Amino acid sequence: MKAQFAILLITLVLFQMFSQSEAIFGAIWKGISSLLGKRGLNNLNDFDELFDGEITKADLDFMREIMK
């Protein structure tokens, strides 16, 4: 009886680990496939505008307005 209970507990733990790892691997695969797909590669070009290192006078004025 103890052996059957131990096997049941081990089976439940392994099944829980498998179901959680499947969700994690699915999320990782979705992220990788979105980066490598045509749309993912086209969307990466949009991020170039975010890393503009120049701060204009309009940016400074806007920041001053926010900080008031």
Curated annotation (Swiss-Prot):
Prosequence residues removed at maturation: 40-68
Family: Belongs to the non-disulfide-bridged peptide (NDBP) superfamily. Short antimicrobial peptide (group 4) family.
N-terminal signal peptide: 1-23
Protein name: Pantinin-2
Disulfide bonds: none
Stretches of the chain forming a coiled coil according to its record: none
Main location: secreted
Keyword Signal recorded: yes
Cellular component aspect of the GO annotation: extracellular region; membrane; other organism cell membrane
Localization per record: Secreted; Target cell membrane
Protein's UniProt keywords contain Coiled coil: no
Alphabetically ordered keywords of this record: Amidation, Antibiotic, Antimicrobial, Cleavage on pair of basic residues, Cytolysis, Fungicide, Hemolysis, Membrane, Secreted, Signal, Target cell membrane, Target membrane
Role played: Amphipathic peptide that possesses relatively strong activities against Gram-positive bacteria and a fungus, but has very weak antimicrobial activities against Gram-negative bacteria. Also exhibits mild hemolytic activities against human erythrocytes (16 uM induce 8% of hemolysis).
Biological process, per Gene Ontology: defense response to bacterium; defense response to fungus; killing of cells of another organism
Entry comment describing in which tissues the protein is expressed: Expressed by the venom gland.
